[in-house]
Amino acid sequence: MKRLMLLGASGSIGTQTIDVVLQHPDEFSIAGLSVGHRIDILKEILKKIHVSHVCVCEEKDMKELAAQYPDIHFYYGDDGLITLAKMKEYDLLVNALVGFIGFLPTLNAIQAGHHIALANKETLVVGGELIEKAIKEYGVSLYPIDSEHSAIFQALQGNEHKEVKRLLITASGGSFRNKTREELKDVTVEQALAHPNWAMGAKITIDSADMMNKGFEVIEAHYLFDIDYDHIDVVMHPESVIHSMVEYVDHSVMAQLGAPDMRLPIQYALTWPHRYPLDLEKPLDLTEVACLHFAKPDLERFPLLALAYEAGKKGGNLPAVMNAANEVANAAFRKKQIPFLAIEDIVINAVHTVTYQPVNTVQDLIDADRWGRDFAYQQIQGVNQ
């Protein structure tokens, strides 16, 4: 029985992780979990599974829940997340949090000797250098949940690092893949959230529409698989059937195919190196797909993808600033405070304005994150004046 600590249980990845756990009740249990403000979802979860520890965002929610569920230990806030991460009574941390808030729980779990199943992109985008050092120091493993990185992870099995020529990360192109730059000026939040292939959370769906998400995945792949940025390519693939590929030095290309269902990479992260049965609503049928298409990405059409390569290669505080500015700008667009293309302007301006600084400590990351957020807030005020 593998005991999980699930952070971000009420989100898209979190709820699908619970679905995987419920499909294999003899293999997995959940020792503890966290949710944000979705107390309604938490109560539904607690009807399905037994947990001993729960973290919520607000102290008032913690107190109310503690009275309703006396057999559960409740915590709240960032400190509560770190408390869960540090606990000894679990085997694998599943980090499904969204944003920079996911970094410190990952780091603390590693320092406590826990293996990580990672869906939180920002852990590696913002703090990849520190996480890389910690993983080596504490001898733990990191298993990717992102479908693209899971595909690469699977395609690498049985081969050696020196045999890899390049990684090919596929990209659907998001909600606006067929729109021109001119057409993007007036797109709505509702249009941006209508992803053609995947059912995801709101933030990542917007990040997919402007390809910031794919840029994050390039940086993640660099740290996950120790591959230089010049050997990581993005390939447009609108069908989302091939989730990513690995080209080897003999020019063989290994690809992982599957239905666009996140439960598949979630389960593989939980069960590696084994494979368990999985009930999917619609498994992949290649005869229905019939045709697959591929193209090179237009970096002028998707400038945030180019920016991610730039920030990743330079390193230091630039990825943290990029992420922070994007978190703020993405949220502002979803709140209808800025137009869609303003997200790009704000994030690009942040990275090109900040003074480069090396990142040696957690405080360096916190400072970079704060700078990026403050800059983005100022830019948003300028857009609205």
Regions found by a protein language model. Give the residues of each.
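Catalytic, metal-anchored helix/loop core of enzyme active sites in primary metabolism
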Residues: 1-385
